[in-house]
Amino acid sequence: MTIIDTNDTICAMATPAGGAIGIVRISGTNAIDIANSLFAPKNKLANARPSSLSYGRILDAQGQEIDDVLVSVFHAPHSYTGENSVEISCHGSRYIMTEILKALILSGCRQAEPGEFTKRAFLNGKMDLSQAEAVADLIASTNKATHTMAMSQLKGCFSEELKTLRAQLLKLNSLLELELDFSDHEELEFADRTELLDLVNRAVSKISSLVKSFETGVALKHGIPVAIVGKTNVGKSSLLNILLHEDKAIISDVHGTTRDTIEDSIDIDGVTFRFIDTAGIRQTTDTVEQIGITRTYNKISEASIVLWVVDQQPTEAEYSDMLQKCEGKKLIIVKNKCDIAPSFTLSHTDIPNAEISAKANIGIDALTALLIQVADIPQLTENSIIVNNIRHYEALTRALDHLSRVREAFDLGLSGDLISEDLKLVLIELGDITGGAISSQETLNNIFRHFCVGK
């Protein structure tokens, strides 16, 4: 792993330009000295108490005033990055913030790479790798669910779970390796096999639970995909528009108006639902409409929930066809046009359903409540552990595979050295998630390049 050059001081905008207030961030050994050289009154920052605010003026390299500013000074290791750090709060003008950056760079700073502040925080032990990734998730959070997941991971709930499990496995693996030093005494067993197998079983149960949470985590992070399907002119586009509170889809009495999928998202009770309006299902010779209907079936396969919009009792053949296409999905039947169409009772009463009028805005609240119920999202707290990162999911899946081989080795009565080899692979996978076993600079760069520059 590349070690930080402590003589290298970086700077970047920590907030977008154009707001009322902008923040320029500096971190590195010379951060305070460089900021002090551009600050008036002179030496005020050098003598400032740690974590204090100082009011003054920021100057360019020629001594010309750029702006009135408030400057925060943080001494290592008591800062976000663990290094000497300075944050300059100025007016949010792009010109002002750019001029401050120019002055800092001319005075010895380097423009930070994307995510470099958080990368330094990780390398300096201020947070582990999964917590660093949670910083990006927190910045990107758009609702209560994504915010809660990010805060839980940032607090270290996920990390502590893995570190505790890894420490237990490491202890027993060390005892297995100790047996190798006494291989001449085959009767010696330092690692209690019953205790080890019990721990492996508990690890399998815990990691399996985390792996299973990934589907929920991804849905919460990117939005639960909901396909709106049905025949032409049953009100699918009207339903999409009323759910989104805007005229997203064209509404017409002409059959086959919607020929392609239309997608948009909305938050319902702190959860993002990604609605997909699809082309109406019917027999047609129109080539373009046929393509749209094919895409409808594709969207059903991608959805977690399907809203089947009807305005009359479906036939048994239609039920059979829809149930087959929605196998493994959560299906809701939406009886539309309740204000004008004759009332009817569904023959399949076991399927969740709602009666609405998309045009007259009747029953929509009941439908959204049913969506939340059918989605069956777990109640999230600040301590909830939900996996939503593909890197974590893949590492956990590999760890689970290695643990399965450990159990097979027990069943076959294999020696401790063979069991130890697979246990080591489990330890590596768990360590990779928190960064304890990360050795590839390429891996770190791939993670942090997705951050904004000022973070």
Tell me the role of every PLM-derived stretch.
Residues 19-20, 51-53, 302-306, 328-331, ...:
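Short glycine-/polar-rich loops that comprise or flank the Walker A/P-loop
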Residues 289-313:
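Inter-motif core of Ras-like GTPase G domains
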Residues 275, 309, 334:
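Generic enzyme active-site microenvironment
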Residues 244, 279-280, 304, 311-312, ...:
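Short glycine-/small-residue-rich Rossmann-like dinucleotide-binding loops
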Residues 16-18, 64, 80, 220, ...:
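Conserved catalytic network of the ASCE P-loop NTPase/AAA+ motor domain
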Residues 2-13, 144-267, 284, 315-455:
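C-terminal-of-GTPase-core extension/linker across diverse P-loop GTPases
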Residues 54-75, 256-284, 302-305:
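Switch I (G2) and immediately adjacent beta-strands of P-loop GTPase domains
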Residues 1-148, 152, 156, 332:
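A glycine-rich (often HGG/GG-containing) alpha/beta subdomain
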